[in-house]
C-alpha cells in the first residue's frame, strides 16, 4: 500500500482557523411548480438574445478582468 499525501496531524487546519460566522436568515426556497416556473423564466424569458457564447448556469455577475 502507498502512503497518503500529507500527514493526518495537519488535517482540518484551514477550517479550524477560519472564524465562525452565524447563519443568515434566508427566504425559504420555492418548491414544485413555482420552482419550475422560476427556472424557466431564468433560462428562457429573462435571457437576453445577444452575440457571443451562451452564459453557463453557474456563472456569476462579476466582470472578468483580462
From Swiss-Prot:
Gene Ontology molecular-function annotations: structural constituent of ribosome
GO term, biological process aspect, one: translation
Source lineage: Eukaryota, Amoebozoa, Evosea, Eumycetozoa, Dictyostelia
Keyword Ribonucleoprotein belongs to the record: yes
Disordered: region residues: 1-35
Keyword terms: Ribonucleoprotein, Ribosomal protein
Protein name: Small ribosomal subunit protein eS30
Residues annotated as transmembrane: none
Amino acid at each position: 500500500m502507498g502512503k497518503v499525501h500529507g500527514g493526518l496531524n495537519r488535517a482540518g487546519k484551514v477550517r479550524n482557523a477560519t472564524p465562525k460566522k452565524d447563519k443568515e436568515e434566508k427566504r425559504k426556497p420555492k418548491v414544485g411548480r413555482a420552482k419550475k416556473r422560476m427556472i424557466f423564466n431564468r433560462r428562457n424569458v429573462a435571457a437576453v438574445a445577444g452575440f457571443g457564447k451562451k452564459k453557463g448556469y453557474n456563472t456569476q455577475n462579476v466582470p472578468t478582468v483580462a
